[in-house]
């Protein structure tokens, strides 16, 4: 992700929510959701947080609650994320993976038209700033093992189990 200027940071708001996989810290700007962080993180509170940032946080919280209740299979949120061109192509390709399904890192590499870049795809997924919303937990190793996950393999298992139990 690109470094944010002091002015951009001042307009950022955060919210800690409790979910079935533990606490998540949501971070948003006036443009959209910037991060979903595993665990509770106390971030500096700015009096300059815009109403728009607060609105993005509220909407993200609602949609995440719907997801964990099995009532939402796809997120509809404005995102304010940045990475390299390759990272962004990998992150947005995650939206092509259906709820309750998994694909391999090699299959995701083909989705972004870089069939030999499966390791780079895994690395980009590891830097996904909005895990769950852009569902990198749905990407597994070609041999069927879970591979890695920024939130830990126990959380990846829980997310996949949740989606498999709520399919249909």
Regions picked out by a protein language model, each given a short descriptive name:
Residues 1-116, 162-168:
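Basic nucleic-acid-binding alpha-helical/helix-turn surface characteristic of O6-alkylguanine DNA
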Residues 98, 129-132:
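Histidine- and aromatic-rich ligand-binding microenvironments
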Residues 119-121, 126-128:
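Regulatory, non-catalytic segments
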Residues 132-139:
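Short Lys/Arg-enriched helix C-cap and helix-to-coil transition segments
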Residues 142-168:
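…primarily DNA-binding HTH/wHTH and HhH modules…
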């Amino acid at each position: 992700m690109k470094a944010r200027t002091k002015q951009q940071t001042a307009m950022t708001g955060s919210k800690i929510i409790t979910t079935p996989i533990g606490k998540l810290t949501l971070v948003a700007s006036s443009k959209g959701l910037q991060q979903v962080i595993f665990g509770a993180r106390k971030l500096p509170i700015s009096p300059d947080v815009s109403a728009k940032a607060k609105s993005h946080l509220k909407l993200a919280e609602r949609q995440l609650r719907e997801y964990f209740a099995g009532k939402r299979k796809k997120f509809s949120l404005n995102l304010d994320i940045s990475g390299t061109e390759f990272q962004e192509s990998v992150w947005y390709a995650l939206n092509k993976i259906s709820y309750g399904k998994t694909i391999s890192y090699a299959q995701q590499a083909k989705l972004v038209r870089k069939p030999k870049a499966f390791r780079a795809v895994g690395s980009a997924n590891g830097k996904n700033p909005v895990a769950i919303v852009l569902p990198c937990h749905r990407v597994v190793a070609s041999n069927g093992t879970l591979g890695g996950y920024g939130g830990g393999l126990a959380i990846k298992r829980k997310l996949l189990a949740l989606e498999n139990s709520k399919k249909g």
